[in-house]
């Protein structure tokens, strides 16, 4: 992940962009199949979480073939992007500071770490992004607020707090780019579709609490 991200910054070739998308398909697929279906099989509603991350993997697979996300650099949010990039490494440090050890501690390839890294990556290259991926990940981040109190996981407060401004910036960019299209039927239908997706994902994730 670090090597591919560095390659996107230094030499954003077509190969580098496709490799990052393949990596995202693998990473989200691993969370869906290995982490939730196998490792967390005893947890209630684990199948919903597996489907959730499986859908994100499919969205990246679709992006791989269509080239929808061009990974074009947007340098406006360097500070926030840097914070989001650091989060996956702060997660295990905070778990370790609380006296936890593997497998109880949060690692860099667990769902919350992957979510915050992906949000940071897409914010850094936010000229045009797959908004469905953003919606899914932002729902996950907001659910993290409740996990802080329900499951006593203070690490998730990092994810939730850092992604709130990212959510605002993503949708600010989206509406700025599409403001001139608001009278077109296609744009309005897409807005309603995104709202519907938000509601459905929110309901499904709330069932896992």
Which residues make up each language-model segment?
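Final/C-terminal transmembrane alpha-helix of multipass membrane proteins
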Residues: 190-208
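Membrane-proximal helix-loop-helix units in multi-pass membrane proteins
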Residues: 43-120
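N-terminal topogenic module of multi-pass integral membrane proteins
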Residues: 1-41, 205, 209
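Membrane-helix boundary connector in multi-pass membrane proteins
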Residues: 38-42, 123-133, 142-155, 173-185
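Loop-to-transmembrane alpha-helix initiation sites
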Residues: 45-50, 149-165
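Membrane-interfacial loop-to-transmembrane alpha-helix junctions, especially the N-terminal start
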Residues: 12-25, 73-81, 126-137
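Alpha-helical membrane segments in multi-pass integral membrane proteins
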Residues: 85-88, 101-146, 158-164
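Aromatic-anchored segments of alpha-helical transmembrane domains
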Residues: 26-34, 84-95, 137-149, 201-206
